[in-house]
Design a protein with these regions (language model features):
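Bacterial N-terminal signal peptides
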Residues: 7-15
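Acidic, low-complexity segments
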Residues: 4, 18-149
């Protein structure tokens, strides 16, 4: 009797797990080796248009890259990348760039930086904060994108 109950319990668990996987089939295409949170926001009541946002995090739980996918945008993805200094503070926020047909996957930082530099025609397509030299880490200045700053 115990074996029958055990088999029924395992069967119920496995059927629930397979059900959860089929409902989120669009998420199976994401980068499995990176920590991420994926959200889908419907932009029309009929459910035919949506926006997917995938936030990828580094090993310390800091936001590293955000990818926006739109259902009506020819499969183009807008990618935003963020860098940190050795103290864990934001050091550079790169301007967003478009990558076609990526499916929301994580893109290597060097590829994002190269594309941003080429897209904007500037050697510094990122904003950059300057922090005070104290344990409080207060921001003193904020430089905008572009080498002119």
């Amino acid at each position: 009797m115990k074996k029958i109950l055990y088999c029924m319990f395992i069967g119920a668990l496995l059927s629930g797990e397979s059900n959860a996987q089929t409902n989120n089939s669009w998420m199976e295409l994401l980068s499995a080796d990176k920590n991420h949170i994926a959200t889908r926001t419907y932009t029309q009541e009929t459910g035919v248009a949506w926006q997917d946002k995938i936030d990828y995090y580094d090993g310390l739980g800091r936001l590293e890259q955000s990818v926006l996918r739109y259902s009506h945008n020819n499969n183009n993805n807008m990618v935003m990348y963020q860098e940190y200094d050795p103290q864990g503070r934001t050091s550079r926020e790169w301007l967003p760039v478009i990558f076609p047909n990526n499916g929301g996957k994580f893109i290597l930082p060097d590829v994002v930086k190269t594309k941003a530099t080429a897209t904007y025609g500037d050697n510094a397509p990122y904003s950059r904060p300057v922090y005070e030299a104290s344990p409080l880490d207060r921001m003193l200045e904020q430089y905008g994108p572009g080498q002119d700053w």
